[in-house]
Amino acid sequence: MIGRVKRAYQRRKVAPKVRDGVVQKKHRHLATAALGFVVDRQSPAKGCRHIVTKRDIHEFTSIIPNWSRIREGLEGVVLTRGDDVDGLYRFYSKDRTGSIEIPAWDGDLWTVVTLEHFEEHRALFQRLAVPFEPKDGGIECRFTLPQAKAFLLLHVFLHELGHHVDRMQSKQQDSSRRGESFAEQYANTVSSLIWPEYVRVFGDPTRSAA
């Protein structure tokens, strides 16, 4: 909502959800590994809307290098209702699998983020040509729909995928030991690498900038 500083995409909010790839037990889980890679969609919470679609996820993963190998141990993606966390990687210890959650967008496309969050992601905001200005103790980012979708895919999704890669590269494959810094670096690296393919598949989000 315009006029207040919204939570930055910190990817973590409430216990007992996964924290840096460590298992949590709050929600029931039915293993879907036997079904292959599954993309599920929850109804958005009040005031939220899904910007990323199931088709977007399938098209986006098709341009990630070595996706068939990277997706090993990943059950799928859930497009969540969007009212509690900003993106999440869950690890299910019993099944030795994980899943990625991408939230519905909360409120207006124009959103105020913290200065810290803005600086951490300035390079991507500039690549997407997102207009911005200081407002209400933070930075108002004036996303268009294509820019918001690009941010969710090129950063939020890839960040959570980074936690999965981190876990799968660990000796026991039971936790994402390198944490947020590895996931952030992974997202930034892959985002830059696949940018030309992203534009080819989804169109250039900078053309929608005011």
In which residue ranges do the predicted regions lie?
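Aromatic-rich peripheral "rim/lid" segments of glycoside hydrolase catalytic domains that contact
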Residues: 101, 205, 209-210
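Post-HExxH zinc-binding segment in Zn-dependent metallohydrolases
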Residues: 176-206
